[in-house]
């Protein structure tokens, strides 16, 4: 089998999900991850600086929406590099997070926490 045929065969058998245009989707007027869990932004993150300030212990309660290897910025979605070297998705320049206390899709119990966490609305 030549290389071209091998590449074509791999493309045919690769799940389309890895080619998704965006890391999030809209559900009930808010952004969610692929499991339907609500996404949040943090007021203390500076829009567009390519950095998350939610690290260490904070990140245990507010896990970052991490990008898979090979993830690429697209439209309103960009990537930021975290202090630990991981790559995190951002929307309109703001890093995206989940909230550990949300237990099922549609929960949005993190909205307004400490007046600095907010549900992301496109």
Regions found by a protein language model. Give the residues of each.
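N-terminal secretory signal peptides that target proteins for export/translocation
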Residues: 1-2
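Bacterial N-terminal signal peptides
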Residues: 7-17
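Compact beta-sheet-dominated domain cores in extracellular/mature segments
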Residues: 19-122
